[in-house]
UniProtKB/Swiss-Prot annotation:
InterPro entries: Topo_IA, Topo_IA_2, Topo_IA_AS, Topo_IA_cen, Topo_IA_cen_sub1, Topo_IA_cen_sub2, Topo_IA_cen_sub3, Topo_IA_core_domain. Mg(2+) binds at residues 22, 109. Transmembrane segments: none annotated. The gene is topA. The record marks 46, 165-166, 169, 174, 181, 345, 545 as: Interaction with DNA. It is an enzyme of class 5 (isomerase). Residues 733-771, 846-888, 910-947 are annotated as: Disordered. Residues 915-934 have a biased composition (Basic residues). The lineage of its organism: Bacteria, Bacillati, Actinomycetota, Actinomycetes, Mycobacteriales. This is DNA topoisomerase 1. GO terms for molecular function: DNA binding; DNA topoisomerase type I (single strand cut, ATP-independent) activity; metal ion binding. Monomer.
């Protein structure tokens, strides 16, 4: 830990003050504003927490029945707090600093977490000097000096709210997660919000899987207005067929998820066109003239968007910048701590009077008086927890720095987020955008049939706030930007139009779009689940747990997520019920507002009581009883079986979630009538909605034994290519009399007692992993035989007498002589390198560590937008990772070396940069002499302080 910032004594005998914040960056900034009378140091986040593992539980509590929870559920839910191992030196240092000051200022963030950090600091440091709570929502000199001059008391209601959530999440996770370990797979987790978020994503995938597409047609007409008005602008435009003989032509909105017309449609007034009908109508209209039946023009206005709050910033950064929620919040945190924007965790869209004035002044200077709204705009919304209702996210200060003014001070990501916040804030005080819409109804005849075409246009007459900011639409969900224009000629009723071209246009309805991070945040917010400050961590958690992976920007659930969600829905329905979870959030907010007693609430939730609605967890006997009663009734095979559909013979097809991954299964009747399972491995890149009956049949038809390539002419053994647990490989099939001791693709066999016998007891088939340049579907017998020759003997070193071999390893091709390995530059070298060439390589001095020759990259990508350097995918000690030569970022679950995009690689690098350098084990702190502290009243909770 670095030395404190500031002097240990004030000027002219003024009080010496210690200010504690969460981060070193924040400490540096505050130290510059507060001056030498203040010592500013950081706690680096929370210093205490519940035990993470059983090993963290102090010895005297290990025998307690509640020890595994870290919460004494029998004593008013007292939490067992321990100082986390990595923070012990920090606590020692802070205690030493506290001995030389007259006042302690706790300047952590003003939300639940910040208030809790401040409370834990008080309980751990046990200060004997006056303690003041210093709160600010932006890090500017004016805000910091004002906060120091007007401190407040610690808000215990807010501390209670944080502690209750922490205890609740611990009880939920530690009681429900073991059910998943026993019934689904080890290392899974359940959570109050993460399980509901997973259910939302799974349900959307279910909807996609059940979706039946409907096909419908219409006609697009290209029309010429010059026959009536040679000066019309534009002269040509397009219109779409909307009615035939008084019947409205069906559009995608008229069809339901099953591919039929929706129940609320008046079927007698709708016509569904097919290819033939549309083509016939188009043929009948060729060369005809159409008439404008009506032209309706209307004025419209569009109001600016409110300034950002946490959730809308995450959504817009996701849509506009393609940033993940985690990446957005990490960047916003840096901007806040360095004094560029206000606090980034807020539910409020309100601006202070000075911020409104700053935005209006800047809009006036940059765009002109006419672009500023006539009066100040204030955006108010109902905030669940008034005590956490900070100002909206905006540029810091009483005057805003323009993006141009700070572009040289910020990195690329920081600049993009700052510009986004600045534009949104300034635009919020600008004038409405104004424009006109024009709707044309055009009629004609196709033989005996009366047809109606429609065209709609939009023209922006005054951009207003759109000069500064245009909100981005979610591409997966469709939509149109606010500044998009569609110009039509100004026509009047009765004018004639020539038909230039007619195109029958076929359409198919699309399944509901998968959630992106942005749309998931919006859904969680609309449902009232979680709070904006937690959304980024929730989305990260469901990906880290393997429940969800990204495909482009879409969130795709895994089959494990299906199994877990199904189990929770069937046996713990209230825990993943949207309304119940939202109601629980409101109740927790009531604790923060001082309207609910936390101990009583937790007691009802865990042990049961008369709290909540008729079927609440409390009235059902509480969480503990719910888990205890239900766990024995859970059929593991049932919850791990996801029925997809019936095949053509009425046989159910299931996805089974097994210990080594998901697989397909159905039962087939043998000649004797006995049912035997037919199974097929699932490709990890196949998404659930892509697993159709046709695809399933193809997988079932793929031989489990692999693709036969041919016969080795030397041994007569059959050579097959397989896809194994550790990737694709080739192997030889030994004759039955040679294969008494093990399966070719296992190398071991099970004994009667279930133990695996060594493959060395019998012949072992030759195997070889495919090279990176090879594909399982196209590899030839010739390629396979070359692989089976590896490791290839190159020759014998005449000097040492040691054999030199060429081999293929995890890190690429290499030479091996005894214990001395040297990398090869290409895979082809393994098959063609000569002894002389190998000896030349060994004659060169061996370079160790980072100076050694690196294996070739797994894949080359484009340029990183932040560093401007090329990105490579490499294979490292802990698996594949992306690098630009400066920053390394491991690929996460769901990221595939072959399919990863430049955009995703850049996102991983940006996330890694945002987390800062890798933390090395801290050096042992020097001992700081401290006076013996007076015995204080015991802290709430079971606290374990360092000796």
């Amino acid at each position: 830990m670095k030395g404190p910032r500031g002097s240990r004594s004030g000027r002219n005998g003024s009080p010496r003050r210690l200010v504690i914040v969460e981060s070193p960056t924040k400490a540096r900034k505050l130290s510059g504003y507060l001056g030498s009378a203040y010592i500013v140091e950081s706690s680096r986040g929370h210093i205490r927490d519940l035990p993470r593992t059983a090993a963290d539980v102090p010895a005297k509590f290990k025998s307690e029945p509640w020890a595994r929870l870290g919460v004494n559920v029998d004593a008013d839910f007292e939490p067992l707090y321990i100082i986390t191992p990595e923070k012990k030196s920090t606590v020692t240092e802070l205690k030493g600093l506290l001995q030389g000051v007259d006042e302690l200022y706790l300047a952590t963030d003003g939300d639940r977490e910040g208030e809790a950090i401040a409370w834990h600091l008080m309980q751990t440091l046990k200060p004997r000097v006056p303690v003041k709570r210093m709160v600010f929502h932006e890090i500017t000199e004016h805000a910091i000096l004002a906060a120091a001059a007007h401190p407040r008391e610690l808000d215990i209601d807010l501390v209670d709210a944080q502690e209750t959530r922490r205890i609740l999440d611990r009880l939920y996770g530690y009681e429900v997660s073991p059910v998943l370990w026993k019934k689904v797979a080890p290392k899974l987790s359940a959570g109050r919000v993460q399980s509901v978020a997973t259910r939302i994503i799974v349900q959307r995938e279910r909807d996609r899987m059940a979706f039946c597409s409907a096909v419908y047609w219409d006609i697009v007409a290209k029309l010429d207005a010059s026959v009536s008005d040679p000066t019309a602008q534009p002269l040509t435009f397009v219109a779409r067929l909307t009615a035939v003989d008084g019947l409205r032509v069906a559009t995608g909105r008229d069809f339901g998820a099953m591919g039929t017309l929706r129940g609320d449609c008046e079927v007698s007034k709708i016509i569904v066109l097919d290819d033939l009908t549309a083509t016939t109508l188009a043929a009948g209209l060729r060369g005809a003239q159409l008439t404008v039946a009506s032209a309706e023009e209307k004025l419209y206005t569009r109001r600016p968007y409110p300034p950002f709050m946490t959730s809308t910033l995450q959504q817009e950064a996701g849509r506009k910048l393609r940033f993940s929620a985690e990446r957005t919040m990490s960047i916003a945190q840096r901007l806040y701590e360095n004094g560029y924007i206000t606090y980034m965790r807020t539910d409020s869209t309100t601006l202070s009077e000075s911020a409104i004035n700053a935005a209006r002044t800047q809009a006036r200077q940059l765009y002109g008086e006419e672009y500023v709204s006539d009066s100040p705009r204030q955006y108010t919304r109902k905030v669940k927890n008034a005590q956490e209702a900070h100002e909206a996210i905006r540029p810091a200060g009483e005057t805003f720095a323009t993006p141009d003014a700070v572009c040289n001070e910020l990195d690329g990501d920081e600049f993009r987020i700052y510009e986004l916040v600045w534009r949104r804030t300034v635009a919020s005080q600008m004038a409405d955008a104004r424009g006109t819409t024009l709707s044309l109804r055009i009629e004609g005849r196709a033989g005996e049939q009366h047809v109606v075409f429609s065209a709609s246009g939009r023209t922006l007459t005054f951009p207003g706030f759109l000069k500064a900011y245009v909100e981005t639409v979610d591409e997966l969900a469709g939509g149109e930007a606010d500044d998009a224009e569609r110009r039509l000629p100004h026509l009047t009723s009765g004018q004639l139009l020539d038909v230039i071209d007619l195109t029958p246009d076929g359409h198919a309805t699309n399944p509901p779009a998968r959630y992106t991070e942005a749309s998931l945040v919006k859904a969680l917010e609309e449902l009232g689940i979680g709070r904006p400050s937690t959304y980024s961590s929730i989305i990260k958690t469901v990906q880290d747990r393997g429940y969800v992976q990204k495909k482009g920007s879409a969130l795709v659930p895994s089959w494990v997520a299906f199994a877990v969600t199904g189990l929770l829905e069937q046996h713990f329905g209230r825990l993943v019920d949207y309304d119940f979870t939202a109601a629980m959030e409101d109740e927790l907010d009531e604790i923060a507002n001082g309207n609910e007693q936390r101990t009583n609430w937790l007691n009802n939730f865990y042990f049961g009581g008369n709290h909540g609605v008729s079927d609440s967890i409390a009235r059902s006997g509480g969480l503990k009883k719910l888990v205890g009663v239900n766990i024995e009734g859970i059929d593991a095979r049932e919850v791990n079986s996801i029925k997809l559909f019936d095949d053509e013979h009425g046989r159910p097809v299931y996805v089974r979630v097994g210990k080594t991954g998901p697989y397909l299964e159905r039962l087939l009747a043998g000649d004797d009538g006995e049912l035997t399972p037919q199974r097929a491995n699932l490709n990890g890149t196949l998404t659930p909605d892509e697993l159709t009956l046709e695809v399933a049949e193809e997988l079932f038809a793929t031989p489990h034994e692999g693709r036969v390539l041919g016969v080795d002419p030397e041994t007569g053994h059959e050579i097959v290519a397989k896809d194994g647990r550790y990737g694709p490989y080739v192997t030889e099939v030994l004759p039955k009399h040679d294969d008494d001791y093990g399966a070719a693709d296992q190398g071991t066999k099970k004994t009667k007692k279930g133990r695996r016998a060594s493959a060395s007891q019998g012949p072992k088939p030759r195997t070889g992993s495919l090279l990176r340049s090879m594909d399982l579907q196209t590899i030839t017998l010739e390629d396979a035989l070359k692989l089976l020759l590896l490791p290839r003997v190159v020759g014998v070193d005449p000097a040492s007498g040691e054999e030199i071999t060429a081999q293929n390893g995890r890190y690429g091709p290499y030479l091996k002589r005894g214990k001395d390995s040297r990398p090869l530059t290409t895979e082809d070298q393994m098959f063609i390198i000569t002894l002389d060439e190998a000896l030349k390589i060994y004659a060169e001095p061996k370079r160790a560590g980072r100076q050694s020759t690196s294996p070739p990259p797994l894949r080359e990508l484009g340029t990183d937008p932040t560093s401007g350097k090329p990105m490579l995918i490499k294979d490292g000690r802990f698996g594949p990772y992306v690098t630009d030569g400066e920053t390394n970022a491991s690929l996460r679950k769901g990221d595939d070396v072959v399919s990863i995009t430049d955009e995703r690689a850049a996102e991983l690098l940006a996330d890694r940069r945002a987390r800062g350098p890798v933390k090395r084990p801290a050096k042992k702190a020097r001992k700081v002499p401290a006076k013996k502290a007076a015995r204080l009243a015991p802290a709430r909770g079971i606290s374990q302080s360092p000796r």
